Amino acid sequence: MFLLFLLFVVSQVGLLVFSPKFKDLILFRWYYQHIYYPLFTDYTRYRWKYWLVPGFYACILIFCVHLFYNKLNDTVNPYLYSLEKAFIPITIAFTSLTGVASVFVKPLGLQAGPQFQPDYIIFHPSAVCQTCKTIKVPRSKHCPICERCIPLHDHHCIWINNCVGYGNYEYFYSFLLSNCLLLTYASLRLLTLFRITAFKKDKFFLSLFLLTTAFSLIAIVFTYYQLKLVNDGMTNNEQDKWYLVQEYMRNGNLVKDMDGVLYYRSMSTDAQTAEPIFYSTNLYDHSKYHLINPAKILSHEEIINLYDRGSFLDNLKERIHLLD
């Protein structure tokens, strides 16, 4: 039975990897059209798929709570301090509540969100959302899964099947931090109990230790990444845009005109004048520009992030709707 299961898993991995590349072949065509494309490419089909990861993580947390209270409580409880006995259920409840809030509290609408000024680098005025056909507010982004534009958009999180944006940052960050606290505490506390011989061969104890350790590491890494973005004064969505600008600079193609407006140099030249062609950093502007004596940008210090308020706390306050 195990070999059949292993064969099934390997075959599915192979089909997932190769079906996009060989989708014109009969062997892979059906799988690509009915499995790969609707699951991984088409946002509108099989929308239940977006609940698989949140459901999986909820099951992991529920299973860990089950192991602790139903399988290990009688043996572990005598070694816990009174403060710990109160801390554990409170932290579990807080993690659960912030998780539910992160899933079901949606970001606010564009008009209710903060109205940022364009920086003329990664956000430009009068840009129109190609899906909503409305003016794009700086720092917003259209989410094809949520099917609307999100103010101060960070990313669509697969762990909560919800966009993280202005209006639910406070719940999302609380959920991340509570996971870090609960899982790290559980992992370290169980580690201290390994000295007791009775626990070393207990399969439930080992299972709980491995699960809490693995997911605490995942939670810590992801939380660190999110808080670093806050410290840098950017969102996950903006980081991708800044990376593109930095890439232009590293390749020596980022320039500014006499007014300080940024452009990037194309590899092609004008067919008539043989002069280099420049494009705006505005991805919605496909016009060709001819610049006179443009200055090359040589350092990231020459590029100012208008949205960085200068400190972690100031950047964080800007995202918290409840503090507005």
From Swiss-Prot:
It catalyses: L-cysteinyl-[protein] + hexadecanoyl-CoA = S-hexadecanoyl-L-cysteinyl-[protein] + CoA. It is an enzyme of class 2 (transferase). It comes from Kluyveromyces lactis (strain ATCC 8585 / CBS 2359 / DSM 70799 / NBRC 1267 / NRRL Y-1140 / WM37) (Yeast). The keyword Electron transport does not apply. The keyword Transit peptide does not apply. Pfam families: DHHC. GO terms for biological process: protein targeting to membrane. It is a multi-pass membrane protein. Residues 1, 71-84, 195-203 are lumenal. This is Palmitoyltransferase SWF1. Residues 23-49, 106-173, 225-324 are cytoplasmic. The gene is SWF1. Its main location: endoplasmic reticulum. Belongs to the DHHC palmitoyltransferase family. SWF1 subfamily. The DHHC domain is required for palmitoyltransferase activity.
